[in-house]
Amino acid sequence: MNDKVFTKAIKKQFEFDEEVAAVFDDMLQRSVPFYKESQKISEFFAQKALQNGGIAYDLGCSTATLLINISRKLQNKATLIGLDNSEAMLQRARKKCEAFKADIELENADILEYDYREANLFISNYTLQFVRPLIREELVKKIASSLKKDGLFIFSEKVISHHSKLHKDLIECYYDFKKEQGYSEYEIVQKREALENVLIPYSEEENIKMAKNCGFSHCEVVFRWANFATFIAIK
């Protein structure tokens, strides 16, 4: 189903409700540049982290596409756990897991309060940016403390530039991308307004500093397009 969420006037802040869940896969493909390519990076490193089994969490798993792809490529059995606080997303995730016969645990949970087991891998795709800055660092600390030594945290985020002109140009570049994907100027403005004060991105440097401050020995960008970046942090 095609994303038409913002073709009409929106009178509320953005939320992952049934209307968004119904078109979310299409929304990702058309809103996140090189989404499939960044996902393939996550899949590759997931195979590395889980080559001897273990546990992996996807925080904000949405419709579970990434976990399903990981499960199909694993050579050894591993425990894959998807967490999301949107029941609409999880309902679609469960149907997809059933259709693909994917053995994935899906839970409606608050990722800030969840009691994590010791894990080999955490993945967070465009989720941290929706966590308020005051508690974002606490979540990353919790992730680090729940990982085994040398465990991986793969996270993708929209990023900002602290150079005002470059920041403006990167946004313009991204809006050109969205127009190429068929979104109208009206839809772009509507979504931007709906996300205001809901999606709060950091710069590339701020994300790396946060990871290192929270218990990771190393963190770097492994993929970037304009103002979208994928990071890998190693405990």
Swiss-Prot record:
Catalytically driven reaction(s): prephenate + S-adenosyl-L-methionine = carboxy-S-adenosyl-L-methionine + 3-phenylpyruvate + H2O
Enzyme Commission no: 2.1.3.-
InterPro entries: CmoA (IPR005271), Methyltranfer_dom (IPR025714), SAM-dependent_MTases_sf (IPR029063)
Protein biosynthesis recorded as keyword: no
Protein residues bound to S-adenosyl-L-methionine: Y35, G60, C61, S62, D84, N85, D110, I111, N125, R192
Cysteines paired by S-S bonds: none
Record keywords: S-adenosyl-L-methionine, Transferase
Pfam family, one: Methyltransf_31
Annotated function: Catalyzes the conversion of S-adenosyl-L-methionine (SAM) to carboxy-S-adenosyl-L-methionine (Cx-SAM).
PANTHER family per record: CARBOXY-S-ADENOSYL-L-METHIONINE SYNTHASE (PTHR43861:SF2), TRANS-ACONITATE 2-METHYLTRANSFERASE-RELATED (PTHR43861)
Subunit structure: Homodimer.
Protein name according to UniProt: Carboxy-S-adenosyl-L-methionine synthase
